[in-house]
Regions:
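Metal-dependent amide/peptide-bond hydrolase catalytic core
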Residues: 1-159
Length: 159
């Protein structure tokens, strides 16, 4: 009999990722020992080093500039700072693992304001981006996103 278990491990820092991966292997083997498995039945933990996504790192100085430009363009009340999330995105690769290229990733709200207010009131989560129930409101979402991006481009290209 063979059991295969696949996991996605997400961390904000590479050293934490290495510790988590080592702990997974240690726990798997510890459980096998505790269950009395013979040596030839010990779990084999394979980590695919190439199959991971680095954490997105928003450069603080760049993020301040982008946030100020977007606030100026669409109104400060329409820009909120979000807590870090464990969402995986290959955007992280643009700044490289050492963050030597400044990057800033931001989201654009796309939910019906009535549903957003209801979610805030009740605590019920809204469907996430990859959910089949995610239903963005095209306008004003597209308009707002274009204004925000243009404000960012103008800020970052001014002399």
């Amino acid at each position: 009999m063979k059991l295969k278990c696949s996991l996605t491990v997400r961390t904000y820092k590479a050293d934490v990722r290495e510790r988590v991966l080592a702990a997974i292997e240690q726990i798997a083997k510890g459980c096998a020992v505790a269950a009395g498995l013979p040596q030839d039945k010990m779990p084999e933990v394979n980590v695919l080093k190439t199959e991971h996504v680095n954490a997105v790192y928003n450069n603080p100085e760049l993020t301040k500039r982008v946030a100020a430009a977007v606030k100026n363009a669409i109104g400060e009340q329409n820009v909120v700072q979000k807590s870090p999330t464990m969402a995986g995105d290959d955007f992280a690769d643009f700044s490289l693992a050492d963050h030597s290229i400044p990057a800033c990733m931001f989201n654009v709200g796309a939910v019906d304001p009535v549903k957003a207010a209801e979610s805030k009131k009740t605590g019920a989560p809204l469907p996430s981006l990859h959910s089949s129930k995610f239903l963005p409101v095209p306008e004003p979402t597209i308009h707002t996103a274009v204004i925000g991006m243009m404000a960012t481009v103008l800020e970052l290209t001014k002399k």
